[in-house]
Amino acid sequence: MKKIVSMLVIVLISASISSLIAQDNTQLGLDIAKAQEENRKQLISYSWQRSVKAFSNGEEKNHSLVKVWFNTEGKMESSVLSSESSVKQQRGVRGRAQQNAGEDLLGLVGNALNLSIKYVFLSKGYWIDLLDEAEVKVEDGLVKIDAKDLLAKGDEVHYIIDSSTNLFKSINISSVVDGKPFTSSIDFKTMSDGTNHPSHTEIVIPSESIKITSENIDYIKQQ
């Protein structure tokens, strides 16, 4: 009888601890979602430039400068300011084939970048579900979150968040775009007014031997 009672006590204690952890993670998800939403409201008042470099087999092939801003609906838009390529353009049929291949590759890179951005701007519902399922550690002033199958089946994402502000320090992603595996790492900085923003992004698509680096610079607050 004593053994049964002891087992029941252990089960009840374990259940209570699990319940408390679930409640804590749910609240953490709400806190992070709130901080991220408030930060987004600050970020949409800025425009900036994005310096993008494309490397193939370790050699720089293209360098573009892009202006980025949010429209009146809060959606991110961009416009190419300049673009320099070291790839020699061929003529005739080969030239057209080269152009088509380049456009396909550009589309692939764009899709990988757009998917990476989605991991930055998650909705409150995603944050709550994420914290319910993910492995979460809070240590040394940081919240570390490891999750799988977040936005796509088989993806893996690792968030590091400042526990004092609930804003990002870094995000590392492993996912698939257009059927091709890729990795993406995003580092964040905080401006003098407290606005948190992606500062450096690196995307690698191994099957295409491509690496893309992106630096966000020259943030200007819109009037």
List the predicted regions and their residue ranges.
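Gly/Pro-enriched, hydrophobic low-complexity segments
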Residues: 140-223
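Bacterial N-terminal signal peptides
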Residues: 8-16
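Flexible, processing/modification-adjacent segments and terminal tails
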Residues: 24, 82-155, 175-178
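Generic beta-strand hydrophobic packing signal
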Residues: 46, 51, 79, 134, ...
